[in-house]
From Swiss-Prot:
<feature type="region of interest" description="Disordered">
    <location>
        <begin position="85"/>
        <end position="156"/>
    </location>
</feature>
<dbReference type="GO" id="GO:0015935">
    <property type="term" value="C:small ribosomal subunit"/>
</dbReference>
<dbReference type="InterPro" id="IPR000307">
    <property type="entry name" value="Ribosomal_bS16"/>
</dbReference>
<feature type="compositionally biased region" description="Basic and acidic residues">
    <location>
        <begin position="85"/>
        <end position="120"/>
    </location>
</feature>
<protein>
    <recommendedName>
        <fullName>Small ribosomal subunit protein bS16</fullName>
    </recommendedName>
</protein>
<comment type="similarity">
    <text>Belongs to the bacterial ribosomal protein bS16 family.</text>
</comment>
<dbReference type="Pfam" id="PF00886">
    <property type="entry name" value="Ribosomal_S16"/>
</dbReference>
<keyword id="KW-0689">Ribosomal protein</keyword>
<keyword id="KW-0687">Ribonucleoprotein</keyword>
<dbReference type="GO" id="GO:0003735">
    <property type="term" value="F:structural constituent of ribosome"/>
</dbReference>
<dbReference type="GO" id="GO:0006412">
    <property type="term" value="P:translation"/>
</dbReference>
<dbReference type="InterPro" id="IPR020592">
    <property type="entry name" value="Ribosomal_bS16_CS"/>
</dbReference>
<dbReference type="GO" id="GO:0005737">
    <property type="term" value="C:cytoplasm"/>
</dbReference>
<feature type="compositionally biased region" description="Acidic residues">
    <location>
        <begin position="132"/>
        <end position="150"/>
    </location>
</feature>
<dbReference type="InterPro" id="IPR023803">
    <property type="entry name" value="Ribosomal_bS16_dom_sf"/>
</dbReference>
């Protein structure tokens, strides 16, 4: 039986991701696989490649032939060089760098801390301020009461 290591396509239209599988060369692309040995997501930046090195080495040793794309993936991960006994077995796989956690600067905070209230000084200043306001409120009321009386006198 001719065994190949190839890609099995999954995902939506224009959003593919693949599984690296070992299957009979005569089966269809998305058919039944003998074994799944990895994953490949080409749309991520950098591309996500995860291949079980031990299983890939086993299948290559028993005669499984990788397709061109899988051979390129095996070279990136370093499995092909390890199988052939060449230098550079560590591969050139780039890993995604993790983003640093966001830390808001404390000194430039938008929300200002509450200041302690001084109750004694404002309390004294509020009482005199209220007294003239009450007097001013009473004065227009008195004038309003006098105004209708004057109108009544004029109309008689």
């Amino acid at each position: 039986m001719a065994v190949k290591i190839r890609l099995k396509r999954f995902g939506k239209i224009r959003a593919p991701f693949y599984r690296v599988v070992v299957m009979d060369s005569r089966t269809r692309r998305d058919g039944r696989a003998i074994e799944e040995i990895g994953k490949y997501h080409p749309t991520e930046e950098p591309s996500f490649i995860e291949i079980d090195s031990e299983r890939a080495q086993y299948w290559l040793s028993v005669g499984a032939q990788p397709t061109e794309q899988v051979a390129a993936l095996l070279k990136i991960t370093g499995d092909w060089q390890k199988f052939k006994g060449e230098s550079g077995a560590e591969g050139t796989l780039k890993s995604k760098s993790e983003k640093e956690a966001f830390v808001a600067p404390e000194r430039d905070s938008v929300i200002l801390p509450e200041e302690p209230k001084q109750e004694e000084a404002p309390a004294e200043s509020e009482q005199p301020a209220e007294a003239p306001a009450e007097e001013a409120a009473e004065a227009p009321a008195e004038e309003a009461a006098e105004a209708p009386a004057e109108d009544a006198e004029k109309s008689e």
